[in-house]
Amino acid sequence: MQTETIHNIPYVNSNLTSFIDYLEKHYIDQKIGAVISTVNPEIAFAAIKDRDYFDVLSSSNFILPDGIGVVMMSRLTNNRLQSRIAGYDVFKELLGVANKKKKRIFLYGAKKDVIKGVVSKISSEYPNIKIAGYSDGYVQDRTLVAKQIARANPDMVFVALGYPHQEKFIHNYRHLFPKAVSIGLGGSFDVFSGNVKRAPSWMIRLNLEWFYRLILNPWRWKRMLSIPKYALTVLKEEKNKKTFYPKPEKDHTKQI
């Protein structure tokens, strides 16, 4: 699948429908495992500051531009990503695929009441999905959860621990469920369960979902400061024509 690279992070250059079709045909149907990371400017800037985290993201099979800021920066640096591919939308599309093909899934993350709400909604709306197991995100022993996932033998693993924890968890334990398609989903479980409202469709169309989140959670303004820092870093890099890290060789076994 075509990618476009922004400060050494190769983003999928596609749209939601085409990406899901590709994933279904080349990975899910073939029972080939894959790791999907969803990256917004905040996460990209975290990778700039943390080499270990950068290496974790780089080990992913697919890195999705989950943030209009990433798409905008691509256009300023002549990379031209087609569109934002939101993790929440990928989650719902994959549930549709799992329901159509009677796949097994494992859900990991969020609070106990939230994960139970997610399980209940999936059971109701996607009756052909086999929920092979689930765990809230507050279990202290993550190795125990990873072994639970391995025993469940799922086709898809959805991890909602927030960055960088979800990406590191998948990176560190993917060898225990190598045939599963695994994805980090941030706060998607909260939205799916109804505990948190997603932005209205018109705001999503206008790429204002970030602003809606800021209105609901004013404390996020400090996190938003990473966006201009990210932009300045990328533009400076483009001007100097250099990358902040050399491209690493993928090592799926290194523990982070």
Curated annotation (Swiss-Prot):
What is its induction behaviour? Positively regulated by WalR. Mainly expressed during exponential growth and rapidly shut off as cells enter the stationary phase.
Top-rank taxon: Bacteria
Q: Which Pfam families match?
A: Glyco_tran_WecG (PF03808)
Alphabetized, the UniProt keywords read: Cell wall biogenesis/degradation, Glycosyltransferase, Teichoic acid biosynthesis, Transferase
Catalytic activity as recorded in UniProt:
UDP-N-acetyl-alpha-D-mannosamine + N-acetyl-alpha-D-glucosaminyl-di-trans,octa-cis-undecaprenyl diphosphate = N-acetyl-beta-D-mannosaminyl-(1->4)-N-acetyl-alpha-D-glucosaminyl di-trans,octa-cis-undecaprenyl diphosphate + UDP + H(+)
Query: Which CDD domains does the record cross-reference, listed alphabetically?
Result: Glyco_transf_WecG_TagA
The GO annotation for biological process reads:
cell wall organization; teichoic acid biosynthetic process
With respect to pH, the record says: Optimum pH is 7-7.5.
Output one GO MF annotation.
Answer: N-acetylglucosaminyldiphosphoundecaprenol N-acetyl-beta-D-mannosaminyltransferase activity
Name the EC number(s): 2.4.1.187
What metabolic or biological pathway is this protein involved in? Cell wall biogenesis; poly(glycerol phosphate) teichoic acid biosynthesis
Gene inactivation phenotype reads: Not essential. Impaired growth. Looses rod shape of cells. No teichoic acid in cell walls.
Family, per the entry? Belongs to the glycosyltransferase 26 family. TagA/TarA subfamily.
Q: What does this protein do?
A: Catalyzes the conversion of GlcNAc-PP-undecaprenol into ManNAc-GlcNAc-PP-undecaprenol, the first committed lipid intermediate in the de novo synthesis of teichoic acid.
Q: What is this protein called?
A: N-acetylglucosaminyldiphosphoundecaprenol N-acetyl-beta-D-mannosaminyltransferase
Source species = Bacillus subtilis (strain 168)
